[in-house]
Amino acid sequence: MKVRTRIAPSPTGFPHVGTAYIALFNMCFAKQHGGEFILRIEDTDQLRSTPESEKMILDSLRWLGLNWSEGPDVGGPHAPYRQSERMGIYKQYALELVEKGHAFYCFATAEELDQMRAEQQARGETPKYDGRGLKLSQEEVARRLEAGEPHVIRMKVPEEGVCKFNDLLRGEVEIPWAQVDMQVLLKTDGLPTYHLANVVDDHLMEITHVLRGEEWLPSAPKHQLLYQYFGWEMPTLCHMPLLRNPDKSKLSKRKNPTSINYYRDIGVLPEALLNYLGRMGWSMPDEREVFTLQDMMDNFDIQRVSLGGPIFDVEKLNWLNGQWIKGLTPGQLLDRLLTWKSDRSTLEDIAAAIQPRINLLSEAVNWAGFYFNHMPQITAEMFESKKLTQEQVRQSLQFAIWRLESQFTWNNDTVSQTLMDLANQMGIKLRDFMPTFFIAIAGSTSSTPVMQSMVTLGPDLTFARLRHALEIVGAPSKKEVKNWEKLNESLKLPKNEATSEA
């Protein structure tokens, strides 16, 4: 049987380095065994999935040098490769499980389930679906379906015993069935959950090995059960260690930039980033640190993966990138520099921004330098204001990050409107509100128009600079984050509603 692996990203945001990390190991594993690596888009979350995000993911993986033999952009014998284009398939399989007695209808409302969880928590129990749908008679189910009542389809799960499955890195894994919820397979809108779509697609696309992050370990019993219910052979599982911040916490954008595009935009070479991701929990047999993708594929052995959480250290990545840069000829380096900032549209935007401010071409360097720098040189003292308290400065940065992150359209209108609305809702005059952002983005209040600068820099560099500024002035504590999230949401409400909310 030919080895087939896959990466299945969800197009709900910016392309994550964790996606590239898992894709790299899937591709190397497949190539090691003379197999195939495919890409599937898991866009069942129709509210958050966007074509723009999908394009960014595909483009960023291609930029790194990762290639797939089948996918939404190249086609293949198992098309379509977007789950949103396969919706009719999933309902068919969910109904098959109901007919076989492995799944059931549940008509519980969201309010009823919330009350159930609240009562369980009051008794000191872990919130979990109580199986109420299993108690309905066939007649009642038929009557309620006929009446068109909203419902979901849930899978049956054993109440006792232990689920056992093998993992390539961990050996036999045991998880008590009591810890496994009766997972929803088909939602009230008829769309599948990740678990059903994932299992059905992996089977139909003949995936033989599933290499994924260890956060999916608790879901493995559900998937094993679904394979048993359908009578299908389950792929071999391999749960990779998660990338972590230097403090050993799970890699998050709050502590480290996580977008592939960010590292591309600051001048990390694709070979260097791929090289660095290859060193996450894995090493070459000769322990050398600098190696190519081909080197990794030629020497790949999944058993060399260490389960200790690999640390994503930006300083180490920068050092490794330096090794790659030093290995180039001057001519090759020039080619890379020109490619790095060769987008004419972006350069024209920068030229338009600095044009009213310069009399000599040589003055362009001072005005445009911050567009090309990694991060502006800023201090906490630079943010001191006669008009704003330190709390207002901190909150304005954090609220702006949260609000801008929800914008999938990144242009002058959306960025400007977001910041102007925030200033208005915080009760701060725009002329007093904006200096914080000039300093965070450009390192000075004497700069090109900051909202346009944010658009030109793009979301990844903008978020990195805003988070850097927030760290400088004082990032919120966990307790503050919870309070600020509520405050940020209440600010969006009409004043009378916001008052009652508070």
Swiss-Prot record:
A single Gene Ontology molecular function, please?
Answer: glutamate-tRNA ligase activity
Keyword vocabulary terms for this entry: Aminoacyl-tRNA synthetase, ATP-binding, Cytoplasm, Ligase, Nucleotide-binding, Protein biosynthesis
Q: Which GO terms describe its biological process?
A: glutamyl-tRNA aminoacylation
Q: Which GO terms describe its cellular component?
A: cytosol
Q: Where is this motif: 'KMSKS' region?
A: 250-254
Tell me which Gene3D superfamilies the record gives: 1.10.10.350, HUPs
InterPro entries for this protein: aa-tRNA-synth_I_cd-bd (IPR045462), aa-tRNA-synth_I_codon-bd_sub2 (IPR020751), aa-tRNA-synth_I_CS (IPR001412), aa_tRNA-synth_I_cd-bd_sf (IPR008925), Glu-tRNA-ligase_bac/mito (IPR004527), Glu/Gln-tRNA-synth (IPR000924), Glu/Gln-tRNA-synth_Ib_cat-dom (IPR020058), GluQ/Sye (IPR049940)
EC number per UniProt: 6.1.1.17
Compartments where found: Cytoplasm
Q: Which domain of life is it from?
A: Bacteria
The protein's matches in PROSITE patterns, at most eight in alphabetical order, are given as:
AA_TRNA_LIGASE_I (PS00178)
Q: Which residues does the annotation say bind ATP?
A: K253
Q: Where is this motif: 'HIGH' region?
A: 9-19
Q: What does it catalyze? A: tRNA(Glu) + L-glutamate + ATP = L-glutamyl-tRNA(Glu) + AMP + diphosphate
Which function does this protein serve? Catalyzes the attachment of glutamate to tRNA(Glu) in a two-step reaction: glutamate is first activated by ATP to form Glu-AMP and then transferred to the acceptor end of tRNA(Glu).
- Assembly notes: Monomer.
Family of the protein in this entry = Belongs to the class-I aminoacyl-tRNA synthetase family. Glutamate--tRNA ligase type 1 subfamily.
Name recorded for this polypeptide: Glutamate--tRNA ligase
